[in-house]
């Protein structure tokens, strides 16, 4: 399983995950990335989302219709910047991931997990076994 010490984070990774920051839209690694695989928490390495639930939302950040395992996600009320939103954090590392909104695809449950690329790491399907995520291969065989 991939893990990263907080001291190894880049400036933007630290600002996003530890200071509840947000990276710029359309200028981040995964906003337009649709390869087959799994997205894991940048710090703990815990699997959070798969490419099967990723969709193009035109918001400029990676968007997913659901989490791989709801137990790996914490949702908190966020009243920052004069808005009322639902913050999404990683359960294992308590890192800020992004926000969840109720404007996602209706046929997939209506949610849009809007996630910062700086908070996640993509594991290609072909490398799942090699990197310790082999148990997730069956998720793609449905």
UniProtKB/Swiss-Prot annotation:
InterPro entries: Met_Sox_Rdtase_MsrB, Met_Sox_Rdtase_MsrB_dom, Mss4-like_sf. Its EC number is 1.8.4.12. Residues 2-125 form the MsrB domain. GO terms for molecular function: peptide-methionine (R)-S-oxide reductase activity. GO terms for cellular component: cytoplasm. The active site is at 114 (nucleophile). NCBIfam families: peptide-methionine (R)-S-oxide reductase MsrB. Belongs to the MsrB Met sulfoxide reductase family. This is Peptide methionine sulfoxide reductase MsrB. The gene is msrB.
């Amino acid at each position: 399983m991939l893990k990263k010490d907080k001291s190894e984070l880049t400036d933007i990774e630290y600002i996003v995950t530890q200071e509840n920051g947000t990276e710029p839209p359309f200028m981040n690694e995964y906003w337009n990335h649709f390869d087959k695989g799994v997205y894991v928490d940048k710090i703990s390495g815990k699997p959070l989302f798969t490419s099967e639930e990723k969709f193009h939302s035109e918001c400029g950040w990676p968007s997913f219709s659901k989490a791989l395992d709801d137990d790996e996600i914490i949702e908190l009320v966020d009243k920052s910047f004069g808005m009322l939103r639902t913050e999404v954090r990683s359960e294992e590392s308590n890192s800020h991931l992004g926000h969840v909104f109720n404007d996602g695809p209706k046929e997939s449950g209506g949610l849009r997990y809007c996630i910062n690329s700086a908070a996640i790491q993509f594991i290609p399907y072909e490398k799942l076994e090699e990197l310790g995520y082999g148990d997730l291969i069956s998720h793609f065989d449905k």
